Amino acid sequence: MRKAFWLLFALALPALAQDPVLPAVTAIHTAPTLGELPPPESLRPCCAFGYDLHVRAAGIPIPMYQIGNVLTLGTLGKHHYNDSAFGAVKNLLGLSEEQNGLIYTRRGGFIDIAHVRDTADNTFYLFNRIAPTLGQAGRIFYSEELGVRRVQLNAYTPPAGVRQRYQLAAWLAGHLAFEIAQWHEIAQWYGFQSVPGFSEEISAFSPEDLYSNLLGARLAINIILSGHGGSLEDYNQAMDAALKQVLTRLLVATRGETEAMFQQIDGDWWNSHRRVPDKFLVLKRNYDLQENRLPTPVPFETMPPYRLTMPEQVGGFRLRDLGELQIYPGHDMQALPVPAQYYGAGAF
């Protein structure tokens, strides 16, 4: 029966494979998993929606300091798997080889490059944890975000074929990494602060966030299935190439065009007179958590938007039946109601 489902999935994939923007990989190339891969320690410090943003600290405006925020295809820098908290510090100090910020595309709307990179890294990490023991029950713990984050993996009989197992593990990893991104938006809304005393409500459900996260998951899945996950160096280089390619296909804008689009939606999507971290600097939010999504519609854009998707089933296996992110009571839950036992992904 499973063979029939894999055949149906294989027949469905050509449509995704012929997608001119982000084709799914059908010719699977396996690579050894990285047993000692450290987890992504923290999220990259970026970005409030808008550009040339003013800042206040401890309620006091900081004059002469602005956050530029705008990137171009030529200023992305080099991707670096986020394997230590020091990576976030380097980003803040401008010492990292990679750059993070916002970039406009005519078919994908605004893209937050930090969100793309974060979910790609989580997908790569989860794949390397899941693939060696695919089908076995297990738990993968992450640091607290209001609650204790636990990826619960369920027991099942996995496919017999090596490539089929590899493919299933990659898609499952992307699905779970996107659930982690979903929860981060919820946690920010309920008061999560990665830096104590610095509110992150400004960033919760920002209009470009989850589309960017899903883009990162899909990029990492393609990189894994193309055989570029055998080393961190190979993964990082593949991310550089894949990110530039998909942004080009989404019709990436120049710096001037991105800034002009920000100016057109000032007062509608964001308020340039507010300062970071004022919650109402961001006026437009997107609360849609789906894995099948269009970018938040941008006024004045005439190009058709590009739909990003994650399949519900791979080879007859429903991804949500194989594992989920669970949130258990934490030490500091802020405004989040305490669950009776835990919040599963179905409660998001």
Pin down the residues of each PLM region:
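Bulky hydrophobic segments
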Residues: 18-202, 221-348
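Divalent metal-coordination and catalytic microenvironments
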Residues: 185, 209, 215
